[in-house]
Amino acid sequence: MKYELKNIKTLNTHDGVAWTASVYRDGKRIGTAEDRGDGGSTWLYLDNRADEADLVAWCAEASKNSGLWMAQYATETIKTHHVGGEQNGTATYELRFNDEMALAYLMEVSDLDKRAKKNIVFRTPRAIPHTSVDTYDTYTLSGRSMATETPASVSAALVYITNKFSNAEVWHSREHMWVSASEMLKDVRAYVPVQVGA
């Protein structure tokens, strides 16, 4: 089973980015999704409401090893404690993987896959003082695609990336996950499709 978003249309608004998309399961349209770009919820409209649990479970499982931000919520319930001072005490809430995170995962994968068709997409960690949140800067190596280049050409690009950014990760669109550039460099042929005549 595979879920994906197609026919994605975006529009910049005053408060963010609005978008609409068709939701597909195994190539068959099963509903639509939208974000109105007003800072509110993301909406999911499925032809059969029972499909929502399957979509959320599939996306949670698919995101676990992806390296994307929502993966941390797929593995367990995150319990966060906020201390509001001595007088206010501590507030606790639980955050579980839900339909909004599932749609965020599908949007992120769709965007990265689209960019990776014509470029090598990679990211590097960015340190933000006094926070434990994983933050990354994402780059593209234009005109180079792991889907169309020869293994030798991709190796040269990976050497450049690892020399410039020692801890870079490259988007692997076939597996929908971030892979360490240095790890990928060890066995490029495992990550690059076999080219005719290469």
Question: What annotation goes with each model-predicted range?
Answer:
Residues 1-198:
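Terminal leader/tail segments of proteins
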